[in-house]
């Protein structure tokens, strides 16, 4: 599994440039026509896949790792889960908290590294989600281990990230950032993309068993996202502890 550039301090698994990048966009997290439009568009797919795999979220304790402005966190809370969302971008968390107050959706947002939370609350969550986050940290395998530690035995951990191959470079960077302008330029670094085999290996080393994988595709003509068997660019992986 490849890694990103550098962390902001020894022992902290964070690329400060990534935190600053998303902090600069924080005010636009809940604008469905902003740079975060793709996340709003794919969120129903992510939520549906989680529910299809893990069952009803009602009454379950859920952790959303790398929650950003809370798009997925809120939707899981609306589905009945008791949700904690963690992120290291304080500005994004501020927006998430404000939106929660406006929408009346209760989520516990915390600015804490996932590794630190794993030491505090091992084996406490029924569902752990880590979506579109692994490609933005220096040591993704460390995040996978922490997510595994946080899950209860027999429960679920979900990941989504980007495959690493020429097609993903063409679609996720050239196409999405430069041609279609779905994302700001510089959102992704190709070297930080993760092959499914690499993620599966990290999951198994952390005590998680991969149980399923789905691809996510975008049709530029209809401007619609859909789940598919094609995992060559964006993919989601379910694992069980």
Swiss-Prot record:
Keyword Methyltransferase found: yes
Database matches in Pfam families: Methyltransf_23 (PF13489)
Lineage top rank: taxon: Bacteria
GO terms of biological process kind: methylation
EC number assigned by the record: 2.1.1.222, 2.1.1.64
Reactions catalysed, as given in the entry: a 3-demethylubiquinol + S-adenosyl-L-methionine = a ubiquinol + S-adenosyl-L-homocysteine + H(+); a 3-(all-trans-polyprenyl)benzene-1,2-diol + S-adenosyl-L-methionine = a 2-methoxy-6-(all-trans-polyprenyl)phenol + S-adenosyl-L-homocysteine + H(+)
CDD domains for this protein: AdoMet_MTases
Molecular functions (GO terms): 2-polyprenyl-6-hydroxyphenol methylase activity; 3-demethylubiquinol 3-O-methyltransferase activity; polyprenyldihydroxybenzoate methyltransferase activity
UniProt signal peptide: none
Coiled coil: none
InterPro entries: SAM-dependent_MTases_sf, UbiG_MeTrfase
Keywords assigned by UniProt, alphabetized: Methyltransferase, S-adenosyl-L-methionine, Transferase, Ubiquinone biosynthesis
Amino-acid positions noted as binding S-adenosyl-L-methionine in the UniProt annotation, renumbered to this chain: 46, 66, 87, 131
Pathways per UniProt: Cofactor biosynthesis; ubiquinone biosynthesis
Chain ranges passing through the membrane: none
Family designation: Belongs to the methyltransferase superfamily. UbiG/COQ3 family.
NCBIfam families: UbiG (TIGR01983)
Known function: O-methyltransferase that catalyzes the 2 O-methylation steps in the ubiquinone biosynthetic pathway.
Name assigned to this protein: Ubiquinone biosynthesis O-methyltransferase
Source organism of this protein record: Bordetella parapertussis (strain 12822 / ATCC BAA-587 / NCTC 13253)
Gene: ubiG
């Amino acid at each position: 599994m490849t890694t990103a550039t550098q962390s902001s301090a020894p022992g902290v698994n964070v690329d400060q440039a990534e935190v600053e990048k998303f902090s600069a966009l924080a005010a636009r997290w809940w604008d469905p026509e902003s740079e975060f439009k793709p996340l709003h568009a794919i969120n129903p797919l992510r939520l549906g896949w989680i529910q299809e795999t893990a069952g009803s979220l009602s009454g379950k304790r859920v952790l959303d790792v790398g929650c950003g402005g809370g798009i997925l966190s809120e939707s899981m809370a609306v589905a009945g889960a008791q949700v904690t969302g963690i992120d290291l971008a304080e500005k994004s968390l501020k927006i998430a908290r404000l939106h929660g107050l406006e929408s009346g959706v209760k989520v516990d947002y915390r600015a804490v590294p996932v590794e630190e939370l794993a030491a505090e609350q091992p084996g406490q969550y029924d569902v752990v989600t880590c979506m579109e986050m692994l490609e933005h940290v220096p040591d993704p395998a460390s995040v996978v281990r922490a997510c595994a530690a946080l899950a209860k035995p027999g429960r679920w951990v979900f990941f989504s990230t980007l495959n690493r191959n020429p097609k993903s470079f063409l679609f996720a960077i050239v196409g999405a950032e430069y041609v279609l302008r779905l994302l700001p330029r510089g959102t992704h670094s190709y070297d930080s993309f993760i092959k499914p085999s690499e993620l599966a290996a990290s999951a198994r080393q952390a005590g998680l068993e991969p149980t399923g994988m789905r691809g996510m595709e975008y049709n530029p003509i209809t401007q619609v996202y859909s789940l598919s068997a094609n995992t060559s660019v964006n993919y989601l992986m379910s694992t069980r502890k």
